Amino acid sequence: MRVLGIESSCDETGVALVEVRGSVLPVLLADALYSQIEMHQAYGGVVPELASRDHIRRVLPLTEQVLAASGRTLADIDVVAFTRGPGLAGALLVGAGVACALGAALGKPVLGVHHLEGHLLSPFLSADPPEFPFVALLVSGGHTQLMRVDGVGRYELLGETIDDAAGEAFDKSAKLLGLAYPGGPALSRLAEQGDATAFKLPRPLLKSGNLDFSFAGLKTAVMVQAKKLAAAQDGSVEALPVQVLADLAASTQAAIVEVLVKKSMTALSQTSLKRLVVAGGVGANRSLRAQLNAECGKRGVRVHYPELHLCTDNGAMIAMAAAMRLQSGQQAASEVYAFDVRPRWPLGDLTASA
């Protein structure tokens, strides 16, 4: 069984083809991705209407690219999967519409996939896939959650952000420092030149006793510190010396990473599990990986990540999630081609609503 996956939830258009071979893990045959970063840079963030229009332009050429790379044709597709949510409504509608039209034209069933489940299962595409059960840290621009994962579709929410996500804290802090979009990676690069102990910033909810996160207060603290530094020099934040900006970037990153790492260790301790899966765009952060590796090593915990190019939104994770749901019997594909999307869709609702 071959599953074509289409991802269009935000500002990346992704298409991939995976193959299910018996009971072993599905195999990625080919994938292609187009990022809209350059287009959105002029606006300092994602413009939903522009994102939707660009998905329309890219999705079919990417599909042709994937089929050519895999040596397959449209006739070889058995199921067409797409991101149903969460995400930008207009962007989701593009992927859903193309997938359902393609399924109807080919007479093949379709399957809507939860975007976060795609991230959650993306490490199964790596050379060192995890085994169930495990604790998962889902950390991206829009979501920060800790989950207990006992199998495909068997997810228990342990904790989540009560305000900003970690990726949002990276991005908004970067904007406060005058860094270009996308801010998170820019802040991390600048942080490599800085002293993480230069500024004392808060670690919200670090000692709360639960596994929830909060990053809004940290973002405010970064803003206050940046304005204070600028006022002391009678200038703008952007005019601050590069080393000062680097120190503030490093201090910001250190605060975010410390919270993520310590909460993850607490989750492992509370569940007595010995595997940690890290997924989502922030999972590519080198400082986060280094500290998680160190702390997990002390505890005899195996930590798994997606391949770096699969940390961002991509079609491979959508195809893989669909294939694993079908393979495990969690869900059947549908030959009903009327579709809807769910811009807001808690992962905890997945089993009940699928």
Curated annotation (Swiss-Prot):
Binding site for substrate: 138-142, 171, 184, 285
Classification via CDD domains: ASKHA_NBD_TsaD_bac
Catalytic activity: L-threonylcarbamoyladenylate + adenosine(37) in tRNA = N(6)-L-threonylcarbamoyladenosine(37) in tRNA + AMP + H(+)
Primary site of residence: cytoplasm
Listed EC numbers: 2.3.1.234
MF terms in GO: iron ion binding; N(6)-L-threonylcarbamoyladenine synthase activity
SUPFAM superfamilies the UniProt entry points to: Actin-like ATPase domain
Needed cofactors: Fe(2+)
Top-tier EC class: transferase
Residues making up the signal peptide according to the UniProt record: none
Role summary: Required for the formation of a threonylcarbamoyl group on adenosine at position 37 (t(6)A37) in tRNAs that read codons beginning with adenine. Is involved in the transfer of the threonylcarbamoyl moiety of threonylcarbamoyl-AMP (TC-AMP) to the N6 group of A37, together with TsaE and TsaB. TsaD likely plays a direct catalytic role in this reaction.
Matching PANTHER family: TRNA N6-ADENOSINE THREONYLCARBAMOYLTRANSFERASE (PTHR11735), TRNA N6-ADENOSINE THREONYLCARBAMOYLTRANSFERASE, MITOCHONDRIAL (PTHR11735:SF6)
Stated family: Belongs to the KAE1 / TsaD family.
This protein's name: tRNA N6-adenosine threonylcarbamoyltransferase
GN (gene name): tsaD
